C-alpha cells in the first residue's frame, strides 16, 4: 500500500532540465495525471497503513547517522569553534559558557526524527485529512522524479506556504510513498505547544526563532546545523523560501537567509550538487480563511497553543474541498549556476571559516529564489472558485448567477491560454460546477434569487459606520485571498494593459517604460525575477497577442477590435493594488508628519482609509490590508522615497514627500523621461 509500484513506469529524475533560469515555458512535457491519495485510505485500514513496512531509498552518498551524532558534529565543528573564538574576543566571555549556550541553542532548535512518531502522525493525519478534504491530488511523476533525486544528491524541498497544513501534508505524502521523511524548518511558536510541539520535533521539525537579529552565536549554530544536514545528506531538508505563511494567499518575495545556508556546501565544494524541488500546494478552500482576513485588518494573530488547536477541532465538521500538491522537476544547482559563477574563488578560503558571499553570488542566490517562487506559481492548480473570485471582486454589488457563469467560462478560456492549470470537473455540467463551488464557499458568498453576493459577518446590536466598513472589508479580503491565488496568471498581461492606458503614447518604448515603472513599484507586491523586465514585458505582450487582444509592431502597440473588454478586465485586476498605493501616497504627502514610527503609521493610515471609505472617496476595501501597506513602505524604501532607522528598538521612517509625490504622479499620469528609474531595474 502506498508503494511506488503503481508509478514504476513513469519517467525518472534524469529528465530534469539542464536549466530553467530563463523561465522558458515550464514543464512542457509534464504529465497531467494526478492521483488522489485519500481514495486508497477510504478503502483500507488506516492502522495498517501506518504500521506497514517503511523502507525509503536513502541518498547514496550518505552514511546513516543518529540525531545525537548529527548534533555532536555541529558542536564539534571547526566553524562553530572559530565563531566562538571571535565572540570570546569581542565580548570577553569564557569559552565554556559559550559552548554551553551553543549546546542549549542546539537542543532548542534540533529535530529528533523517529519513525514511531511518523507512524503515529501518519495514522492521525489519515483520519483528519479524510474529514477535511474530499481529495488530495498528487502528481505521481513528480514523486518519481523526487525518488530518483533523493538517491543522487542532497535534496531541498521548497513548498509555497499558505496554511498550517502545508508541512503536515508533505510529510504524509512522503510517508505514503516510501520516500525519506524530510527535516522541516518550523517557527519557534510551534515548539511551545504542549505535547504537539514534541510530536512535531520527533516528526522531523527543527525550530527557528523569527527575531534572530544580530545574535552571532545563534546564527552560527543554526547555519552550521543546516549545512551539516545538507553536507551529510542526513535527510531531505524542507523550508519555505517565502519565509512566512502568506496571509494574502499570493506569493511573497523570498527571504534569502535559509537559501544561503543550504547552498553554502555547494559553493564550498563540500557537495558536488544539490537538487532544489519547487512544490506547489493549492487549496480549494483554506482552513484559516477568516483568520487571515482579520489578521490583515489588524486583529492580533492568536498564539499557537495546544488548547487553541483543540478548540479549532470544529473545522473537522466542515468541507474544504480538494487539495492539489504538485512536485516540480528537481533542479540541479550546478546546472543552474553553470557559467554564471566562478566557484574557484571560494576554494581560496578554508571551508571551516565563515564565508561571505560577494555581491555577484548574492544576486544569483536571489535570482534563484525568485525563480523557485515563479515555478511554484506556474505549477499551481487553479480552482473554479479562484476564477469566480476574480469576477466577484469586480462586481461587489452582486452579479446574476447566469452572468457569473458566463464570465467564469470566458475567464477559464483566457486563463488556459495564459498557461494556467485549471481544475474543472469533467463529469459535471457547467451549472453544477458553479453551484458546487458556491456551496463549498458558503462562508464567503451566498446566492439569493439567482444573484450572488459576498457574505458579511452579522453581530448583535446596532452597527457603527466603522463596524460596517470593517465587516465589509473582512468579506472582501476573504474573497480577495482566493483571487490572489490566481493573480500571477494575469500579472504581466495586466501590467501591459495598465501601461498602455498610462503611457504618453502607443509607442512600444513608452509602454515599456511605464511597464518597468510598475514592475519596480510592485516588486514587493508581486514576484518578478530581478533583471528580467524585458522578458516579463515580452511575456505579457505575447500572451495578449496570442489571445488576439493587441496588435504589436516594433514601433507601437494597439488594442485590436474586440480586445477592449479583455484590456479593461485585466486593468481591473490590478486596480485594488493601484488604488491602495495611491491612497498611501496621498496620506504620506498630505497627512503624515516628516518622521513617524511604524506603529503610528499603521494606526494613522487605517483611520485615514476608514474615513475615505465611509465618505465614498475611495472604493477599494483592500486598502485596509496591513500587508499591502507594509509592501508600499518597502517599495518606497527601495525607491529612496523613505529612509528607515532604528530608534529605541522601533523602526522610524523619514519621508521625502517630494519623491513620494513624483512616484504618485507617475502612477496616476504615466512614466515621463524626466523621472527615469532604469538604473534600478
Description of each model-found segment:
Residues 1-681:
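Membrane-interfacial terminal anchoring regions of lipid-handling membrane enzymes
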Amino acid at each position: 500500500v502506498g508503494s511506488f509500484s503503481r508509478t514504476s513506469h513513469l519517467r525518472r529524475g534524469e529528465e530534469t532540465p539542464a536549466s530553467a533560469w530563463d523561465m522558458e515555458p515550464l514543464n512542457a512535457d509534464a504529465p497531467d495525471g494526478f492521483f488522489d491519495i485519500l481514495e486508497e485510505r477510504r478503502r483500507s485500514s488506516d492502522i495498517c497503513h501506518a504500521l506497514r513496512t517503511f523502507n525509503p531509498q536513502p541518498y547514496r552518498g550518505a552514511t546513516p547517522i543518529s540525531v545525537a551524532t548529527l548534533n555532536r558534529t555541529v558542536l564539534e565543528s571547526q566553524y562553530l569553534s572559530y565563531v566562538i573564538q571571535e565572540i570570546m574576543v569581542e565580548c570577553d566571555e569564557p569559552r565554556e559558557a559559550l559552548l554551553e549556550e551553543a549546546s542549549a541553542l542546539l537542543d532548542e532548535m534540533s529535530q529528533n526524527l523517529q519513525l514511531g512518531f511518523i507512524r503515529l502522525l501518519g495514522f492521525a493525519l489519515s483520519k483528519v485529512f479524510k474529514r477535511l478534504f474530499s481529495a488530495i491530488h498528487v502528481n505521481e511523476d513528480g514523486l518519481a522524479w523526487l525518488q530518483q533525486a533523493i538517491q543522487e544528491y542532497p535534496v531541498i524541498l521548497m513548498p509555497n506556504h499558505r496554511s498550517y497544513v502545508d508541512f503536515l501534508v508533505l510529510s504524509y505524502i512522503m510517508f505514503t510513498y516510501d520516500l525519506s521523511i524530510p527535516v522541516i524548518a518550523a517557527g519557534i511558536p510551534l515548539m511551545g505547544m504542549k505535547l504537539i510541539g514534541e510530536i512535531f520535533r520527533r516528526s522531523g521539525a527543527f525550530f527557528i526563532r523569527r527575531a534572530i537579529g544580530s545574535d552571532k552565536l545563534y546564527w552560527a549554530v543554526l547555519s552550521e546545523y543546516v549545512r551539516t544536514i545538507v553536507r551529510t545528506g542526513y535527510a531531505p531538508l524542507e523550508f519555505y523560501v517565502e519565509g512566512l505563511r502568506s496571509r494574502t494567499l499570493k506569493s511573497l518575495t523570498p527571504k534569502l537567509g535559509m537559501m544561503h545556508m543550504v547552498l553554502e556546501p555547494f559553493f564550498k565544494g563540500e557537495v558536488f550538487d544539490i537538487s532544489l524541488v519547487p512544490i506547489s500546494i493549492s487549496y480549494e478552500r483554506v482552513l484559516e480563511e477568516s483568520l487571515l482576513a482579520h489578521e490583515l485588518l489588524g486583529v492580533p494573530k492568536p498564539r499557537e497553543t495546544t488548547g487553541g488547536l483543540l478548540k479549532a477541532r470544529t473545522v473537522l465538521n466542515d468541507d474544504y474541498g480538494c487539495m492539489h500538491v504538485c512536485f516540480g522537476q528537481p533542479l540541479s544547482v550546478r546546472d543552474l549556476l553553470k557559467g554564471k559563477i566562478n566557484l574557484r574563488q571560494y576554494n581560496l578560503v578554508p571551508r571551516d571559516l565563515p564565508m561571505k558571499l560577494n555581491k555577484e553570488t548574492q544576486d544569483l542566490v536571489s535570482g534563484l529564489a525568485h525563480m523557485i517562487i515563479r515555478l511554484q506559481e506556474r505549477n499551481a492548480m487553479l480552482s473554479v472558485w479562484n476564477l469566480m473570485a476574480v469576477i466577484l471582486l469586480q462586481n461587489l454589488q452582486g452579479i446574476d448567477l447566469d452572468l457569473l457563469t458566463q464570465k467564469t467560462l470566458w475567464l477559464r478560456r483566457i486563463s488556459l491560454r495564459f498557461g494556467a492549470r485549471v481544475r474543472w470537473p469533467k463529469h459535471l455540467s457547467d451549472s453544477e460546477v458553479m453551484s458546487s463551488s458556491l456551496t463549498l464557499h458558503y462562508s464567503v458568498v451566498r446566492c439569493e434569487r439567482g444573484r450572488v453576493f459576498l457574505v458579511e459577518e452579522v453581530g448583535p446590536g446596532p452597527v457603527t459606520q466603522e463596524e460596517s466598513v470593517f465587516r465589509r472589508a473582512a468579506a472582501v479580503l476573504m474573497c480577495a485571498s482566493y483571487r490572489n491565488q490566481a493573480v500571477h496568471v494575469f500579472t504581466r498581461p495586466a501590467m501591459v494593459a495598465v501601461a498602455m492606458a498610462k503611457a504618453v503614447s502607443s509607442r512600444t518604448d513608452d509602454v515599456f517604460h511605464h511597464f518597468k515603472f510598475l514592475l519596480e513599484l510592485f516588486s514587493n507586491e508581486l514576484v518578478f525575477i530581478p533583471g528580467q523586465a524585458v522578458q516579463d514585458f515580452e511575456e505579457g505582450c505575447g500572451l495578449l497577442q496570442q489571445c488576439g487582444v493587441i496588435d504589436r509592431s516594433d514601433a507601437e502597440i494597439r488594442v485590436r477590435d474586440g480586445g477592449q473588454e479583455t484590456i479593461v478586465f485585466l486593468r481591473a485586476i490590478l486596480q485594488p493594488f493601484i488604488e491602495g498605493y495611491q491612497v498611501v501616497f496621498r496620506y504620506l504627502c498630505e497627512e503624515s508628519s516628516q518622521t513617524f514610527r511604524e506603529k503610528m503609521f499603521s494606526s494613522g493610515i487605517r483611520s485615514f482609509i476608514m474615513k475615505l471609505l465611509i465618505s465614498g472617496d475611495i472604493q477599494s476595501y483592500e486598502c485596509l490590508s496591513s500587508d499591502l501597506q507594509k509592501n508600499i513602505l518597502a517599495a518606497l524604501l527601495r525607491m529612496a522615497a523613505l529612509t528607515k532607522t532604528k530608534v529605541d528598538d522601533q523602526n522610524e521612517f523619514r519621508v521625502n514627500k517630494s519623491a513620494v509625490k513624483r512616484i504618485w504622479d507617475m502612477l496616476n499620469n504615466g512614466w515621463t523621461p524626466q523621472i527615469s528609474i532604469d538604473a534600478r531595474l
